[in-house]
């Protein structure tokens, strides 16, 4: 048996663009992808902190160190430029693997620069 666990998270990223006329996906700064352990074309869940929308899409790599967080295609209707979002990816693990696993959690500032990289988060704490 396997269970689904949080693998990677980019916390409170700022949407820099919403491009309705582009083929679907989310464009993420390659540096943020690398640090958060999110791969190109990986399925991600997006949570918009400002409006509560939750949806899934896949990742394409943006220019490294550009700070780009751009929702493309239909997903562009779910956010607005300037919204704060949480980007999460998941993995399937056995119970034994899950008990030893820690997710990668990346905190960014208002310009999507890396503030902190951790392997855990606790309720009630902003690390």
From Swiss-Prot:
Keyword terms: Autocatalytic cleavage, Cytoplasm, Decarboxylase, Lyase, Pantothenate biosynthesis, Pyruvate, Schiff base, Zymogen
Q: What's the protein called, per UniProt?
A: Aspartate 1-decarboxylase
One GO cellular component, as annotated: cytosol
Indicate where the modification Pyruvic acid (Ser) is found in the sequence: 25
Q: How is it modified after translation?
A: Is synthesized initially as an inactive proenzyme, which is activated by self-cleavage at a specific serine bond to produce a beta-subunit with a hydroxyl group at its C-terminus and an alpha-subunit with a pyruvoyl group at its N-terminus.
KW Cytoplasm (keyword) present: yes
Class of enzymatic activity (EC top level): lyase
Q: Does the keyword Transferase apply?
A: no
Which Gene Ontology terms describe the biological processes this protein takes part in?
Answer: alanine biosynthetic process; pantothenate biosynthetic process
Q: How does it assemble?
A: Heterooctamer of four alpha and four beta subunits.
Q: Please name the GO terms that the record assigns under molecular function.
A: aspartate 1-decarboxylase activity
Q: Where does substrate bind?
A: 57, 73-75
Pathway linked to the protein: Cofactor biosynthesis; (R)-pantothenate biosynthesis; beta-alanine from L-aspartate: step 1/1
- One Pfam assignment: Asp_decarbox
The note on cofactor binding and number reads: Binds 1 pyruvoyl group covalently per subunit.
- Give the organism the record lists: Clostridium botulinum (strain Loch Maree / Type A3)
Catalytic reactions on record: L-aspartate + H(+) = beta-alanine + CO2
Domain of life of the source: Bacteria
* Enzyme nomenclature, EC number: 4.1.1.11
The coiled-coil regions, if any, are none
Its subcellular locations are: Cytoplasm
Q: Which cofactor does it need?
A: pyruvate
What family does the Swiss-Prot or TrEMBL record give for this protein? Belongs to the PanD family.
Task: State its role.
Answer: Catalyzes the pyruvoyl-dependent decarboxylation of aspartate to produce beta-alanine.
